[in-house]
């Protein structure tokens, strides 16, 4: 199926036999596994040049253009090991056994793929922080991939040896993909400002939060690059929001459900912009796993919900906030010049201790890259 994909699929087991049934084809593999494939599924995934444009490797065939009761006229295993299907409308399809096995949807194949799916490594105070050298990440794709896998699975990483010139962050972020611009710019400077338009641009304590919860899609990755940090105070604290959500689910399941099921509004009220988004603090994916944490108390609108739910929701919200402060979850470090944080902003909450701007200069630069770009880059590097 090379024409339909840029990846290659190893031959785990050859096809031993194939037979049609009323609505599809059943194949038996040499290792004994049996996989059914339905007619519409097979026709929908035909990789031939008439069904897939070989230049873009994108499908041009539409399954709605064939009868829903399309039938197999003949099925064989070709000399090259492919599954060959002759359709009753005269079309022919051939499927590479490696591709077919990788996409089989019998119960055993689905279970294998679920077990091999990347899983988040939840962490607490004792995190063994993944640390990488900036030069190696910039020059070596294997190191780049190792770093990106840590960002994906752990959610918090640090780089050393980053040049301390303003803008040095841009080439690093672009090793992944393009930078996501916001109303704070392509790059944003984190330092104390007299006319601050965000609490981040002050010197006082910044509580644990995710950035831009006011957006429909929060930025996936956040970079914070230290150019100079001579001020007293200003340590960084991180917590794994997924670990806290799991602890809350076990310790207070009713509170967990409220934070998953109840949407609340977040607002960013600037002099020149007004961003608003309504979403739950804890978002789940289709399998019930935590997909996203959305929390910044200083960007939260007054709660609006049924009066009977309000008291319990406040208890749940307070419980989550209190858990972010518990030492068992908190990982605290000071970032020095030439070092950089890269973390999953939709999972990891970050905070900053107050600092004394009169004691020395403190200048960070930051930017965002969407999580989709991270996952795409990983898949390309793994080809």
Swiss-Prot record:
Q: In the record's cofactor note, how is the cofactor described as bound?
A: Binds 1 Fe(2+) ion per subunit.
Q: What InterPro entries does the annotation carry?
A: AlphaKG_dependent_hydroxylases, GBBH-like, GBBH-like_N, GBBH-like_N_sf, TauD-like_sf, TauD/TfdA-like
* GO terms under cellular component: cytoplasm
| This protein's UniProt keywords | Carnitine biosynthesis, Cytoplasm, Dioxygenase, Iron, Metal-binding, Oxidoreductase, Zinc
Give the top-level enzyme category.
Answer: oxidoreductase
Q: Does the keyword Lipid biosynthesis apply?
A: no
Query: Is the keyword Transmembrane helix assigned to this protein?
Result: no
A GO biological process of this protein is: carnitine biosynthetic process
Cellular location(s):
Cytoplasm
Where, by residue number, does Fe cation bind?
Answer: 209, 211, 350
A molecular function GO annotation: gamma-butyrobetaine dioxygenase activity
Q: Which reaction does it catalyse?
A: 4-(trimethylamino)butanoate + 2-oxoglutarate + O2 = carnitine + succinate + CO2
Listed EC numbers: 1.14.11.1
Q: In which pathway does it act?
A: Amine and polyamine biosynthesis; carnitine biosynthesis
Its required cofactor(s), as named, are:
Fe(2+); L-ascorbate
Q: Where does Zn(2+) bind?
A: 46, 48, 51, 91
**Similarity-based family:** Belongs to the gamma-BBH/TMLD family.
State the oligomer form and interacting partners.
Homodimer.
Query: What is the stated purpose of this protein?
Result: Catalyzes the formation of L-carnitine from gamma-butyrobetaine.
> What is the official name of this protein in its record?
Gamma-butyrobetaine dioxygenase
